[in-house]
Amino acid sequence: MQEKHYEVIIIGGGITGSALAYVLAEFSGIKNIALLEKYEGLATLNSKASANSQTIHCGDIETNYDLQKATEVKRKADMIVKYCQKHGYENKFLFQGQKMALGVGESEVELIKERFEKFKELYPYLQLFDKEELKKIEPKLVFDGRGEERAEDIVAMGVQSGVYTTIDYGAMANSFVQNAKNVEGKTCDLHLNTEVQNITKVGDKFYIRTANRLSLSADFVVVDAGAHSHKMGLGQDLSTICIAGSFYLTKQKLLNGKVYMMQNPKLPFAALHGDPDLLAGGCTRFGPTALTLPKLERYKGCRSVPEFFQSLNFDMDVAKVIWQNFGDSEVRDFLIRNIGFEIPILGKKLFVKNARKIIPSIREEDIYYAKGFGGVRPQVISHSQKKLLLGEARIGENPGIIFNMTPSPGATSCLGNALRDAKSACEYLGVSFDDAKFDAEMMR
C-alpha cells in the first residue's frame, strides 16, 4: 500500500482533536491534515452529549476554580461561543439558560456571598439570589415534600438569562471537522474505524501503524487519545487513574436551569449538580457519581483495560499518592458511597438522599438510573511531585509530537487548547499562523 503523508496527523476524534483540525485548517498555513478516529464516528466517547453534563464551564459557578483559573477558563469558553455565533449554531447545539451555584447551610451561604463579591467584576452578569428570590425562579430548591420551606438557609449566585450555558459537544465536534473540510485549498482527511497501534519516529518523520493497515506518516503528530506516550517511552513521570461518572434522570422537568453544589476542597471530583438535559426533553439529570474503573473507555467492553494499566504506570510513588488522596476517611467514605450509587435498587435510595440537598422534595420514584450515560475522566498523577494534578495535562517533551489529556473543563477549553497546539505545530514546521484572523473571529 502506498504511504499517505501529512504535515499533521491528529489522533482522536473527540472535541479536542476535532477543534485542532478546524483551527489548523482555518487559521494556519498547514495544508495537509488527517484526523484518525478509532470508532465509527466522531465524539463517540466522552464528548458525546450523554457522556458529560453539556455545560459550558466558564468559571462563574464552578466553586472549585479560583479567580486565576476562572479568568483563563472564561477566555477559552468565550472562544467556543464566538465560534458557534460565527457559524449560526445558536439554538441548534448552543443554548442560553439559567444557572447557579447553590450554598446550603450557614457556612456555604457565607462562602457563596464571599465568592460573589470576588467574582462579580469578572462576570458582571452575576446575581445573588436569596431564598425569597429562589422561590420565584427555582422553587424546587426551597420547598420540601410537604410544601414547607426547607429549614436551612440557602443562597445562590448565578444568572437567569442572556448567557450561553449549554452545548452539545458531540455535535460541535462534528461541525469542527465539516468546517475544516470546507476550507478551500486545504486537505483534511477523516479516517474513521482507524485504531492507532503504534507511533514510531524515524528521522524527522512519524510513522503510524493502524489496525486497519493504513500506511500513514506525518511531520507532526498530536495525540488526543489513549496511552500512546507510555508506549513511546515518553511521559513516564505521569500516571492516570480513571474515574467514571454516572447520572440519574428525573421523569419530568424539575429544575429551570443548571444548579451546581459547592465543591468539597478535599475531593478531586465534580460536586453534584442538576442540569436540564438536551437529550431528555429538559428533564433533570443529576450527577456525576465517581466510580474508579480499570479502563479508559466506558461502554466499550474491556478492550481499553490493557491501556489503563499502561497509563497507570504503577510504582511506589503512585501508591503513595493514591493512599494520600483516597486513604482520607472523608474521601474513602465518598468513594464507597459512590460505589453504592451503581447498585440496582439500593443505588437509587442512596442517591436520592444526596439529591435532596438540591431538591428537598425529590423522591425515589422521581428518578431512574440513566443507562448508557456518563463517561470516564482521567485523573493525572505526577511521580516527581507525588501528588494528584487536577485538570489537564500535556506532554510535549519530544520534538514534533504532543500528547494531551483533557478532563473537565477540556471540552470547554477545546479551542484554546487547539490554538496552543496549532501554534506549536506551526512553529515546529516553520509555517505561518494567522493570529490576527483568529483574534478577530474567535476572541470576544
Region spans (language model):
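Flavin-dependent oxidoreductases
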Residues: A19, I199-K201, T210-E307
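Active-site lid/adjacent beta-loop-alpha segment flanking the redox-cofactor pocket in flavoenzymes
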Residues: Y260-K371
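C-terminal catalytic lobe of FAD-dependent flavoproteins
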Residues: K320-D434
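Dinucleotide-binding Rossmann-like beta1-alpha1 core, especially the glycine-rich loop
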Residues: S53-K140, L293-K295, Y299-V305
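Flavin (FAD/FMN) cofactor-binding and adjacent substrate-gating region
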Residues: V104-Q178, D189-H191, I199-K201, F309-F326
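N-terminal Rossmann-like FAD-binding beta1-loop-alpha1 element of flavoenzymes
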Residues: Y6-A34
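Glycine-rich FAD pyrophosphate-binding loop
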Residues: A25-A49
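Helical element adjacent to the flavin cofactor pocket in flavoenzyme catalytic cores
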Residues: M157-N212, L216, F220, D224, ...
